[in-house]
């Protein structure tokens, strides 16, 4: 509880203690510096959407499935089916900590005094001893799954942050990570109390060179008392949240004049 309370305190310019930023806050900054500033400085958060309970359940079931092979030291069928027979789920005493949302893999970025953390889905290891970051994704669409859409840059940045965090902890990490991307089929006759999925293993070659410059920009932003510019929406155009706040404020002020 103490950890959560400290983490929820607003940033104070010039503070000496490290300021915790999650992987999702880095993504928030990349999307909209203003939303990030409001969150970090004033604890004004974006409204949250509904929980993705089915996606979370799929994540947990995948973890159980891969953990069986982790304990046995054997590759999962999705590995062998994709030519990764020498790859196995990685065993480490801190794996459960790395997976836990409120701890994750952590690293202090000393130049900015930002304490970065992020909860991974899974880690594999190849024959060279390199760790492989793995992220589970779930969806339902008629077309096949990919990571090629513009908005999926967030998926790629997510993986790169995890790769960077593990490297900051002294691990040798492969540039190539994998998305275990499962797609609920809609071409079946009915529901029948079950969903059928088709799963695809998608490789991605990460590059974490953007992370440390971004952390420097984040630190400069929260040190500044002025709100930064509005960012971009995932599908293009100004940030949806900032646009809503602007229009609602304008309408409210107009109403108060009456």
Enumerate the language-model features and the residues they cover:
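Metal-dependent nuclease catalytic cores that hydrolyze phosphodiester bonds in DNA/RNA
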Residues: 1-126, 130, 258
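Residue-level detector of secondary-structure boundary/capping sites
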Residues: 56-57, 153, 233
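Short catalytic/ligand-binding loop motif for oxyanion handling, primarily in non-cytosolic enzymes
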Residues: 37-38, 45-47, 141-145, 185-189, ...
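Metal-dependent nuclease catalytic regions and adjoining charged, substrate-binding loops involved
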Residues: 1-5, 11-16, 20-21, 165-258
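Mg2+/Mn2+-dependent nuclease catalytic core
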Residues: 98-213
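A residue-level signal for conserved active-site and pocket-lining positions in enzyme catalytic cores
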Residues: 32, 66, 162, 211, ...
């Amino acid at each position: 509880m103490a950890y959560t309370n400290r983490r929820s305190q607003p940033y104070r310019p010039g503070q000496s203690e490290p300021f915790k930023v999650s992987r999702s806050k880095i993504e928030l900054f990349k999307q909209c510096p203003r939303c990030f500033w409001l969150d970090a400085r004033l604890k004004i958060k974006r409204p949250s959407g509904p929980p993705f309970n089915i996606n979370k359940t799929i994540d947990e079931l995948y973890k159980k499935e891969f953990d069986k092979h982790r304990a046995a030291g054997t590759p999962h069928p999705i590995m062998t089916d994709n030519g990764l027979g020498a790859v196995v789920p990685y065993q480490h005493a801190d794996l459960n900590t790395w997976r836990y949302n409120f701890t994750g893999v952590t690293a202090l970025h000393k130049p900015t005094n930002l304490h970065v953390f992020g909860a991974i889905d899974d880690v594999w290891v190849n024959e060279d001893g390199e760790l492989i970051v793995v992220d589970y994704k779930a969806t339902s669409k008629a077309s096949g799954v990919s990571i090629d859409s513009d908005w999926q840059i967030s998926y790629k940045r997510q993986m790169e942050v995890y790769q960077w965090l593990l490297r900051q902890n002294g691990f040798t990490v492969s540039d190539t990570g994998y998305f275990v991307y499962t797609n609920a089929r809609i071409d079946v006759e009915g529901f029948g109390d079950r969903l059928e999925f088709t799963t695809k293993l998608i490789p991605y070659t990460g590059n974490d060179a953007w992370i440390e410059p971004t952390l420097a920009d984040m630190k400069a932003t929260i040190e500044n008392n002025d709100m930064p510019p509005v960012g971009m929406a995932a599908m293009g155009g100004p940030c949806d949240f900032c646009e809503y706040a602007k229009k609602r404020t304008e309408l409210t002020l107009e109403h108060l004049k009456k």
